[in-house]
Amino acid sequence: MNNKTILVTGARGQLGKTLEHCWSASGLAADNELVLYDIEELDLTSSAEVQKQLNSINPHAIVNTAAYTAVDQAEQEANAALAVNATAVANLAGWATDRACRIVHISTDFVFDGKSNTPYTPEDS
């Protein structure tokens, strides 16, 4: 992989920081660019902002580690949780799909127990 731009969202979170550290240690940084965005640099819930910022950096791949992580507050702040964990993902996926950009979305393990034999749906509880 040479001369590629990789975008990491949620860059100030635990996983984003770890990815940055691993990137630096991997040797990939010599020939590729890692762009680190957190909420201050990019509001993922704004489709217009996602379009503008991603068009300017034109990443070859996106690693989305951004998430609403206040599990205990998610029910009281359902709109905020939905915006970050669903709308933002849709904005990134829409941009990536239009450009054949690879996207890796990392989700939480706090939602279900993982014992289902079929994919979970929004109606599952």
Regions found by a protein language model. Give the residues of each.
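Alpha-helical structural signal in soluble globular domains
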Residues: T18, C22-S26, N91-R99
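NAD(P)H-binding glycine-rich loop region in Rossmannoid oxidoreductase-like domains
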Residues: S47-V84, T97
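Catalytic helix-loop patch of NAD(P)-dependent Rossmann-fold dehydrogenases
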Residues: Q76, A83, T87-N91, D98, ...
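N-terminal Rossmann NAD(P)H-binding glycine-rich loop of SDR-like oxidoreductase domains
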Residues: K4-A25
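Glycine/Thr-rich phosphate-binding loops of Rossmann-like dinucleotide-binding domains
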Residues: G16, V71-D72, F112-G114
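SDR active-site strand-loop-helix element
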Residues: T9, Y37, I62-A66, I103-T108, ...
